[in-house]
């Protein structure tokens, strides 16, 4: 992230008992990037403090939390010092941004996980990451690009957002579940 290069050099370790092994926070008093990891077969939930513990200073504004990895997901606006739950999927890392200043992202959505394919002004392209059989209320959530219109699968939608339903049958089990043990065999 070129736009945050100047603050990413200031890092500190987070307490392992709260944030897991090798958890780090980088940034300044207004914007922090927090890295968490999970090297187990089960989803791990970390309780992230949106305050001094992660290096964020109080300025009277709400704290915006946005997950950036393994996908982008808006986690909402919260009070300074409050705690949010961040789930880290098995064998994954998570990158969380918390900030109490105006959003620098060019494109920002809420209501659904997504990836940005292209964020160039005039033609941003976003891949929505919904699960089969699920419905989502997708909203344009600020960012530095003003939208006049948007298309989802070639259909025009209003700039206030849209309901999106993904085709297919809703999953009965988690897609990241441990299926079974592997047996050794001769080759």
Where are these regions (language model features)?
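C-terminal beta-sandwich/jelly-roll accessory domains of carbohydrate-active enzymes
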Residues: 11, 16-17, 29, 36-187
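Non-catalytic carbohydrate-binding regions of carbohydrate-active enzymes
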Residues: 1-13
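Glycine-rich, charged/polar anion/phosphate-binding loops
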Residues: 19-21
């Amino acid at each position: 992230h070129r736009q945050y290069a100047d603050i990413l050099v200031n890092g500190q370790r987070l307490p392992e008992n709260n944030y897991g092994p090798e958890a780090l926070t980088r940034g300044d008093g207004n914007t922090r990037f927090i890295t968490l990891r999970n090297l187990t077969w089960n989803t791990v939930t970390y309780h992230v403090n949106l305050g001094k513990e992660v290096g964020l200073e109080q300025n009277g504004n709400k704290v915006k939390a946005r997950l950036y990895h393994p996908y982008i997901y808006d986690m909402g606006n919260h009070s300074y010092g409050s705690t949010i739950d961040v789930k880290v999927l098995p064998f994954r890392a998570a990158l969380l941004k918390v900030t109490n200043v105006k959003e620098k992202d060019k494109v920002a959505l809420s209501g659904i996980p997504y990836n940005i394919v292209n964020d160039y002004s005039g033609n941003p392209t976003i891949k929505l990451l919904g699960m089969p059989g699920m419905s989502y209320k997708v909203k344009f959530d600020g960012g530095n690009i003003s939208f006049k219109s948007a298309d989802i699968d070639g259909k025009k939608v209003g700039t206030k957002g849209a309901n999106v339903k993904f085709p297919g049958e809703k999953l009965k089990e988690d897609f990241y579940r441990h299926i079974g043990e592997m047996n050794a065999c001769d080759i």
